[in-house]
């Protein structure tokens, strides 16, 4: 691993003007969240991970045309229930994130190597080491122009300090460069995504007050060009997405329940949506047609960290590009949603503990459509 580390601060910067360039969303797949990345879009359907045991999965393919799923295994008379199956993904050998880029499936091994899987699932190729991982490290990945960009969050020490790192991995040569590293209390790298020709990420930090209550603070949006990292926007941001074709960035302010539109060409910012309840922030994505939001992160912080809620009813929001509310739907607690994964223009994906399955709602009828298992 070649080291080339930059620690960049957003302090004092109100925003840079850039042109992102056109976007191919099915290539960058920035319409998925990074919280539980177990679904990936390809030209003809979806690849996804389906539980075959408490800790292991099978690699599946859902075909748009037939509207059916198959296990990616061509062994005759295979029961698809163990390590002899070609589709078997061991929870001890792989991280749980699944990606698709330029006709291949990608996963990260528990050791920190990047593994390339053929579209039919028959071949797995170890491309080399991204970094050294421990069992508790969390990772996220996106792709840009023949490179994988990978974030690593190393579990905090007894004082609560966390180390975050970013790597740039060459898919052709297998070389990995560390391009960013920082250590601090409760810090994190989030929303590592590619839009147009550039890759972006968000920095956050968690603090705890004298009463034991936790609060989250955004440290700015950063842009990666090659191995260079710079602050793009110094705002208290929880989540962002970019409409690359129109050079507009949308972000959720932390604590004010407001969605802002930031013009990447002029540097001008304006609010376009204000929450009608006490929701302090939203996770947002853009699927090429609409801005999609959820309050999962806010509700989880309120319940698990600050004990301010006894149930987890999540709400999905569909906004036009100008911020007009097109649709809204509350997912009740009894659906046992663990993660809202978002998705392409067709479907909103989630993971449900009801049957430990990936479920979805057709985006064409987000308000009243059935919640269906992906199968």
Q: Where are the regions that the model predicts?
A:
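Residue position within the beta-strands of beta-propeller blades
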Residues: 47-49, 107, 149-152, 201-203, ...
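Sec-dependent N-terminal signal peptides
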Residues: 1-2
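Repeated scaffold domains used in trafficking and secretory/extracellular systems
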Residues: 31-42, 81-99, 133-145, 184-196, ...
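C-terminal motif of bacterial Sec signal peptides marking the signal peptidase cleavage site
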Residues: 6-9
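Short loop/turn segments that connect beta-strands within the blades of beta-propeller domains
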Residues: 42, 55, 65, 101-102, ...
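Surface-exposed loop/turn elements that mediate protein-protein interactions on large endomembrane-trafficking
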Residues: 11-31, 57-82, 112-132, 159-183, ...
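A generic tandem-repeat structural signature
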Residues: 95-167
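Loop/turn-rich, solvent-exposed surfaces of beta-rich toroidal or solenoidal domains
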Residues: 280-314
């Amino acid at each position: 691993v070649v080291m080339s580390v930059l620690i960049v601060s957003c302090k004092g910067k109100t925003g840079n003007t850039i042109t992102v360039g056109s976007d191919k969303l099915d290539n960058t797949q920035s319409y998925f969240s990074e919280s539980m990345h177990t679904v990936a879009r390809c030209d003809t359907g979806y690849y996804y991970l389906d539980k075959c045991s408490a800790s292991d999965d099978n690699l599946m393919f859902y075909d748009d045309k037939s509207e059916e799923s198959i296990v990616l295994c061509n062994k005759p008379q295979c029961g698809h229930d163990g390590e002899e199956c070609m589709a078997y993904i061991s929870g001890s050998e792989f991280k749980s994130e699944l990606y698709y880029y330029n006709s291949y499936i990608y996963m990260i091994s528990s050791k920190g190597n990047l593994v390339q899987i053929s579209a039919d699932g028959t071949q797995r190729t170890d491309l080399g080491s991204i970094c050294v991982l421990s069992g508790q490290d969390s990772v996220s990945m996106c792709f840009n122009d023949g490179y994988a960009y990978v974030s690593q969050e190393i579990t905090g020490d007894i004082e609560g300090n966390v180390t975050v790192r970013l790597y740039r991995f060459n898919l052709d040569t297998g070389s990995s460069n560390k391009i960013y590293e920082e250590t601090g209390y409760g810090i994190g790298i989030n929303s590592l995504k590619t839009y147009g020709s550039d890759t972006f990420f968000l920095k956050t930090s968690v603090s705890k007050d004298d009463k034991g209550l936790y609060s989250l603070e955004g440290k700015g949006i950063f842009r990666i060009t090659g191995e260079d990292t710079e602050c793009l926007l110094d705002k208290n941001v929880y989540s962002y997405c970019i409409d690359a074709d129109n050079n507009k960035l949308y972000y959720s302010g932390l604590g004010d329940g407001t969605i802002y539109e930031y013009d990447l060409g002029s540097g001008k910012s304006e609010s376009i949506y204000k929450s009608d309840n006490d929701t302090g922030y939203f996770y947002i994505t853009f699927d090429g047609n609409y801005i999609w939001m959820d309050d999962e992160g806010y509700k989880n912080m309120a319940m698990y960290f600050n004990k301010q809620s006894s149930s987890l009813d999540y709400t999905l929001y569909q906004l036009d590009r100008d911020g007009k509310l097109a649709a809204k739907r509350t997912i009740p607690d009894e659906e046992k949603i663990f993660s809202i994964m978002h998705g392409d223009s067709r479907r909103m994906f989630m993971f449900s503990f009801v049957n430990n399955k990936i479920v979805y709602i057709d985006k064409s009828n987000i308000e009243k459509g059935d919640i269906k298992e992906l199968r």
